[in-house]
A protein has these predicted regions:
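Phosphate/NTP-binding elements of NTP-utilizing enzymes
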Residues: 1-188
Length: 188
């Protein structure tokens, strides 16, 4: 199996639909979601940056939450690594965290190997001691990080050519030698 196929298999086996009419059922990746994962993880030249831009209500945030879980306790988990998702506002930053938290609570297997720290918007993968945290530009916590995976949400809200928050995250991640992916979700 390729890296991308392993991520897809992990999502299929362990991630449940976190909300809506089909809550609790296994996630079935849509064709574009599966292709996005395969393109990111199976690129023979490596992927340092990936953009996912689709219309609202097409499962972007749920897909990103599932990818976070694949890096937290799945096939992409790396010992003592750090994952972050960030957005301009606290509310938007917490969206991926909330979806991942729901997926964990819906999965007996994931519930046993992930510690949820709601007050800090943090998840800890107990197998490899991987830490995920949702951060916002409002909190000013982007400096001093060294993530192996950084997810930036709604970058379409950035006005002008420079954004200190995004730059801090991109700079922190660029020091990683083998960063898996930087996934950005433009505003739609």
């Amino acid at each position: 199996m390729t890296r991308g196929e392993k991520v897809c298999a992990f999502i299929k086996a362990y991630c449940k639909i976190p909300a809506g009419a089909h809550v609790g059922q296994p996630i079935k990746l849509m064709k574009f979601q599966k292709q996005f994962i395969l393109d990111v993880y199976d690129n023979p030249h490596g992927t340092s940056r990936a953009y996912l831009s689709v219309a609202r209500k097409n499962g972007k945030s749920a897909l990103i939450a599932a990818v976070v879980l694949a890096h937290l306790v799945g096939p992409e988990a790396k010992q003592n690594s750090q994952i972050i998702s960030g957005a301009r506002s606290r509310d938007q930053a917490s969206l991926v965290f909330k979806l991942a938290e729901k997926m964990i609570r819906l999965s007996p297997e994931l519930s046993k190997i992930v510690r949820i720290v709601p007050s800090q918007k943090m998840l800890i993968g107990l197998i490899c001691n991987v830490e995920y945290k949702a951060i916002s530009a409002e909190s000013g916590t982007a400096h001093g990080l060294s993530p192996s995976l950084a997810i930036l949400d709604e970058i379409g809200q950035v006005r002008g050519p420079h954004d200190a928050f995004i730059e801090a995250i991109e700079t922190a991640q660029s020091v990683k030698v083998q960063a898996a992916a930087k996934i950005k979700k433009p505003l739609n």
